[in-house]
């Protein structure tokens, strides 16, 4: 019972990036005892994890295999209203505008600072 209560009080963050080093770096930057991290390495896996788990925040890369972050964000937005932050090396204004237009709440370019 206590374990279940602890799990429910955690803030679940889905990190979706095809680069394991980025996923690990984000987990280090965001290290907090109240965070539980889910990992996806492509957009299809990200959509599945959001559909099957209580996710409170998604950190989404754009350039990934199977389903890119733009399409994954669109699919997630069809059913969910949780915050999505795109983290991408694509830094053109058009990329940022597209990311925000498909439903991302913010867009941060890589490389990024933990303060961002």
Identify the role of each PLM range.
Residues 39-57:
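Acidic, metal-coordinating helix/loop segments flanking the phosphotransfer/catalytic sites
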Residues 51-55, 75-82, 102:
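Conserved phosphotransfer cores of two-component systems
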């Amino acid at each position: 019972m206590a374990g279940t209560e602890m799990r429910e009080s955690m803030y679940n963050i889905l990190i979706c990036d095809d680069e394991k080093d980025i996923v690990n770096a984000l987990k280090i930057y965001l290290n907090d005892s109240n965070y539980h991290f889910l990992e996806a390495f492509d957009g299809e896996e990200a959509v599945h994890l959001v559909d099957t788990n209580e996710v409170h925040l998604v950190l989404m890369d754009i350039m990934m295999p199977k389903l890119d972050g733009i399409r994954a964000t669109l699919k997630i937005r069809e059913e969910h209203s949780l915050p999505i932050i795109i983290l991408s090396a694509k830094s053109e204004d058009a990329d940022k505008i597209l990311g925000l237009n498909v439903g991302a709440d913010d867009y941060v370019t890589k490389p990024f600072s933990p303060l961002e």
